[in-house]
């Protein structure tokens, strides 16, 4: 299992998820909701300058991705 870089911003996470087929559904305040239709997945990403590792792990889990897949999309 490879480590992900620390200090990823919400914008960087959003771009990586968009490369994986997610689209921005809506944004309200400091949170973005991204959705993929096939296979269905919906993820909430905080629009913060830095996302904690636990939050990032939860985002990857909800997206159905492993860290290596995500790293390739960065």
Language-model segments: which ranges?
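Basic nucleic-acid-binding interfaces
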Residues: 1-27, 31-74
């Amino acid at each position: 299992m490879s480590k992900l870089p620390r200090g990823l911003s919400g914008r960087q996470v959003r771009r990586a998820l968009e490369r994986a087929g997610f689209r921005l559904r809506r944004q309200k305040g400091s949170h973005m909701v991204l959705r993929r239709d096939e296979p269905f997945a919906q993820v909430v990403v905080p629009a913060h300058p830095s996302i904690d590792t636990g939050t990032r792990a939860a985002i990857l889990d909800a997206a159905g991705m492993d860290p290596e897949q995500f790293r390739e999309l960065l």
